[in-house]
């Protein structure tokens, strides 16, 4: 039996997150429904990341076993795109070894967060965090350096996350990609739940001048969620790429 991986994008607006759950629309649920229509049997998938409701993906990766050996990667891609809803698109497919699990094989996950400081555009409201105040990008860049490396990220986790809070952030870049559009790029091997959005929320406080860049270091060292700023909204976040 062959095993395939797929890289795919999705608009997270109308999904209750990535992970399959009963009675709600999820990305994994739609993916497995499409596979069941193709193969006429239940196919289970393993994903590289579990995005929250409203979060988008440019390069999510999932893997699954294929019960029909004669199919090639291009057949998998075409069949899935013919059966998936319009807010999910498979960009490529490839054959992988039998024990390939993208969640554990991933060496780097790259997230992008978009902040617009322009006048609100109703057509982009589900894809950027509209923020009516100007942000000091240089101060945000200084603050971001305190978060790079291996740290206890308890201050930036979701309150009920029981996982080991020690994580390594390889790099954080803050870029003006267009006039009044800021991209915050966060790279690491793995992240706690809501960790990227909590980091963004705190960096924005620095950008507003409400916190000094050094305040981020104190928040990190406090290891307390109460010390950090509020969570940035989900619709500005994208799982941009997963590297193996």
From Swiss-Prot:
Catalytic machinery residues: 52 (nucleophile)
Gene3D superfamilies, alphabetized: Pseudouridine synthase I, catalytic domain, C-terminal subdomain, Pseudouridine synthase I, catalytic domain, N-terminal subdomain
Entry EC no(s): 5.4.99.12
Keywords assigned: Isomerase, tRNA processing
Pfam families assigned: PseudoU_synth_1 (PF01416)
Residues reported to bind substrate: 111
Catalytic activity: uridine(38/39/40) in tRNA = pseudouridine(38/39/40) in tRNA
CDD domains tied to this protein: PseudoU_synth_EcTruA
One GO-annotated biological process of the protein: tRNA pseudouridine synthesis
MF annotations from Gene Ontology: RNA binding; tRNA pseudouridine(38-40) synthase activity
HAMAP family membership: TruA (MF_00171)
Family recorded in the similarity comment: Belongs to the tRNA pseudouridine synthase TruA family.
Subunit structure: Homodimer.
Purpose: Formation of pseudouridine at positions 38, 39 and 40 in the anticodon stem and loop of transfer RNAs.
Protein name as annotated: tRNA pseudouridine synthase A
High-level lineage: Bacteria, Thermotogati, Thermotogota, Thermotogae, Thermotogales
């Amino acid at each position: 039996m062959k095993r395939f991986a797929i890289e795919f994008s999705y608009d997270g607006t109308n999904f209750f997150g990535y992970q399959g759950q009963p009675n709600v629309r999820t990305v994994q649920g739609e993916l497995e429904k499409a596979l069941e229509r193709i193969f006429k049997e239940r196919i289970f998938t393993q994903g590289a990341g579990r995005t929250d409701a409203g979060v988008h993906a440019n390069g999510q990766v999932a893997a699954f076993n294929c019960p029909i050996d004669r199919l090639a990667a291009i057949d998998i891609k075409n069949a899935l795109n013919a059966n998936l809803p319009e807010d999910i698109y498979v960009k490529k497919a490839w054959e992988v070894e039998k024990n390939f699990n993208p969640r554990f094989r991933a060496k780097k996950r790259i997230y992008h967060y978009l902040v617009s400081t322009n006048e609100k555009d109703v057509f982009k409201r589900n894809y950027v965090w509209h923020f009516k105040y100007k942000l000091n990008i240089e101060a945000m860049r200084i603050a971001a350096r305190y978060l790079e490396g291996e740290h206890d990220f308890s201050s930036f986790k979701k309150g009920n996350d029981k996982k080991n809070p020690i994580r390594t952030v390889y790099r954080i870049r803050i870029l003006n990609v267009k006039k009044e559009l800021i991209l915050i790029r966060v790279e690491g091997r793995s992240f706690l739940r809501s960790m990227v959005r909590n980091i963004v929320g705190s960096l924005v406080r620095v950008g507003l001048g409400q916190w000094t860049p050094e305040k981020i270091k104190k928040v990190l060292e406090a290891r307390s969620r109460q010390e950090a700023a509020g969570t940035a909204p989900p619709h500005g976040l994208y799982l941009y790429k997963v590297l193996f």
